[in-house]
Design a protein with these regions (language model features):
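Charge-rich, well-structured scaffold segments of protease-associated domains
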Residues: 1-84, 101, 127, 151-152, ...
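His/Glu-based metal-binding/catalytic segments typifying zinc-dependent metallopeptidases
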Residues: 16, 85-141
């Protein structure tokens, strides 16, 4: 299915371009060749390498003390190895600008777009989160939806989001549009991306976003 679904095709083309030989650049589903070549030993080794105490997160809520929880975890997870297989390091996304096309016979084009993002631990992360809500993360209230869909009818949906991965950060989004109008959609998105960079947001937009996000 991933070889015939336009969204999967553009997603894989995007990951390959942006992340190259890093694991983020390969398909989550593998390839026909790589999956066919898997053995039982490969599966066991992957399982043993992934489940280890150095990458385990546990949360607990309820009538239990720290000591009781520690004893329970030791009994349940004590046999796990202390450390697992080495994790891939950070990767600097390759974002040279421009447009790359993955040819596929379909009446509608799917577009993925991105720029460098921001780490969740960055002190400006929540400001960026609000900014993204105004630009493309706020559904019908967002600028992208207003300009690309409501005013011009170029798409049924367009959005952006902060993609804070463990090894890389992106600010990215997607839009689907008819082949004969997708170039216009891309131009409008670029213009709005630039406008929010140069002009910022209005006091009303900021207040509305903060009110929505805080309930």
């Amino acid at each position: 299915a991933s070889q015939t679904d336009p969204r999967d095709i553009v997603g894989q083309a995007f990951d390959s371009l942006v992340f190259g030989d890093h694991p983020y650049g390969s398909s989550l589903d593998g390839t026909i060749e790589s999956v066919t070549a898997l053995t039982r030993d490969d599966i066991l080794a992957a399982h043993q390498g992934a489940l280890a105490r150095d990458r385990l997160y546990v949360s607990a809520v309820g009538d239990i003390t720290e000591a009781e929880l520690a004893a329970l975890l030791d009994s349940l997870l004590g046999d796990l190895p202390e450390s697992g297989a080495p994790l891939p390091g950070n990767v600097a996304p390759n974002l040279p600008g421009g447009v790359k096309v993955a040819d596929f016979a379909t009446p509608q084009s799917i577009v993925a777009f991105a720029q460098p993002g921001i780490d969740r631990d960055d002190p400006d992360f929540f400001a960026a989160y609000i900014l993204n809500h105004i630009l493309g993360g706020g559904g019908f209230e967002s600028r992208l939806m207003s300009e690309v869909r409501e005013k011009r009818g170029l798409t049924y949906g367009v959005y952006s989001y902060l993609a804070d991965k463990d090894a890389a950060q992106l600010w990215m989004g997607s839009v689907a549009s008819a082949n004969d109008r997708v170039a216009e959609a891309i131009t409008v998105i670029r213009d709005e991306w630039d406008r929010i960079h140069t002009e910022g947001v209005t006091p009303e937009e900021l207040e509305n976003a903060k009110t929505y996000l805080t309930g």
